[in-house]
Amino acid sequence: SAASDVYKRQMLTDNFGNPSSLHNLGINAMKQIILARGAIADSLGVDKDEIIFTSGATEANNMALFGAAKAKKRLGNRIVTTAIEHESVLESAKELEKQGFEVVFLEPDIHGNISEEQLFEAVNKNTILVSMMYINNEVGTVMPVKSVAKAVKRAGAPALVHIDCVQAYGKVNINPKKLGADLVSITAHKIHGPKGVGALYV
């Protein structure tokens, strides 16, 4: 859009300084980061200190999966996801599988749906992470993300819940706390923002 193009040009020409620097360019850049972090936090209904900027959706998803698995590995070994996640999630899950984690890839039906029953059956007391996208980027299926936290609680699992909201952000209302999500991935380019900018709610 015209508005986003103007803002992007402004960031490239006026606010390109190192935000860690003490000179004016750096200070101005830091102000923009603080404003952006606050805007994203407000859109999700979370605290600004819970937002980490990344280089995009892939890094946000990688960080969520590897970070959660390593943080919880003493409490269990099972990771539950679906077979139709974004490649950044699937490849991370496969790498964790090579490292010795038990990864369950839930298979969708012919319409691309994953049922709540599949989720409840897959999540057990040994589950340390459940990762699922909110809306599938290929077929548009709305996944049962609201049931993920319910499945974790029902199983008495120590699992963290990661929801990939990249395709959903800006289209549906997302509140990580209401979803019971510990980690949420989003990215700018899906809402007409610049490429190479993403965020992870932690």
Predicted feature residues:
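Pyridoxal 5′-phosphate
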Residues: S1-V202
